[in-house]
């Protein structure tokens, strides 16, 4: 995709890929991480594409390490099994991993199924409504603070949430809009509500204790942003709901 960052330090390479390969943690169902191309069957997404680009620049092999959801990816990183991922950069997560500067920002919203009477954000917080969130996600921690009357229902991942909609176990699902739009593509008649309940700031995450790599990582992010590589990756991933980095 682009030339290697000039004068890449061996210390940074060793810090980012200590096993001689870049182990990229990803989970299915979100174009932010990885989704399956309906035409080719190939797995791709922002995390996968940026991980491949960084591995290329480091001149090390790329290795995909798959999990079911972001909480498992971050647990794998904390355990030393993952070198690189892309995640919402929250203060809670920053206690366990190190983040680059913001890559992109994403709107947070709600998905409703076909024929839902819910038309706008003020309709969401009503007694009896069941709002799905991904187990271990930032949304799981935030939505209960925003909604006083609706019931929050954890789901293993986006695929399980779609199944829960089919069984009429959910009335809405809350997460970032790229994931919601990806889900809506698989649910005829489903809608992503207008407006947002928050914004996620997405950054590259690496394990704590690899400070020798942070300057290299900062330059990598800066270069993919200014060169157009990030824009290309966002378009290739089909990310919708992207707003200016905050």
Description of each model-found segment:
Residues 2-88, 154, 227, 236:
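Extracytoplasmic small-molecule ligand-binding "clamshell" domains
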Residues 1-7, 45-57, 116-122, 128-130, ...:
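Extended ligand-binding regions for polar small-molecule ligands
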Residues 20-28, 43-44, 122-139, 151-152:
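Short loop->beta-strand "edge-of-pocket" segments that line small-molecule binding or catalytic clefts
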Residues 48, 52, 56, 61-125, ...:
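Acidic, polar ligand-binding/catalytic clefts
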């Amino acid at each position: 995709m682009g030339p290697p960052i000039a004068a890449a330090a061996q210390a940074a390479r060793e810090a980012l890929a200590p096993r001689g390969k870049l182990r990229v943690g990803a989970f299915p169902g979100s174009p932010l991480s990885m989704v399956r191309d309906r035409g080719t069957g190939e797995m791709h997404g922002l995390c996968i594409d940026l991980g491949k680009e960084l591995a290329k620049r480091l001149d090390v092999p790329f290795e995909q390490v798959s999990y079911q959801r972001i909480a498992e990816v971050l647990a794998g990183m904390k355990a030393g099994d993952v070198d690189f991922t892309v995640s919402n950069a929250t203060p809670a997560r920053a206690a366990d991993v190190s983040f680059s500067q913001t890559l992109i920002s994403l709107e947070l919203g709600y998905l409703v199924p076909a024929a839902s009477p819910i038309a706008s954000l003020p309709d969401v917080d009503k007694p009896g409504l069941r709002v799905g969130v991904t187990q271990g996600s930032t949304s799981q921690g935030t939505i209960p603070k925003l909604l006083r009357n609706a019931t929050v229902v954890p789901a293993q991942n986006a695929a399980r949430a779609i199944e829960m909609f089919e069984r009429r176990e959910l009335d809405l699902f809350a997460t970032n809009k790229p994931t919601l739009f990806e889900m809506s593509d698989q649910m005829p008649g489903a809608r992503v509500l207008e407006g947002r309940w928050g914004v996620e700031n997405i950054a590259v995450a690496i394990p704590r204790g690899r400070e020798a790599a942070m300057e290299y990582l900062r330059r990598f992010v800066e270069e993919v942003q200014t060169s157009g590589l990030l824009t290309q990756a966002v378009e290739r991933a089909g990310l919708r709901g992207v707003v200016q980095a905050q």
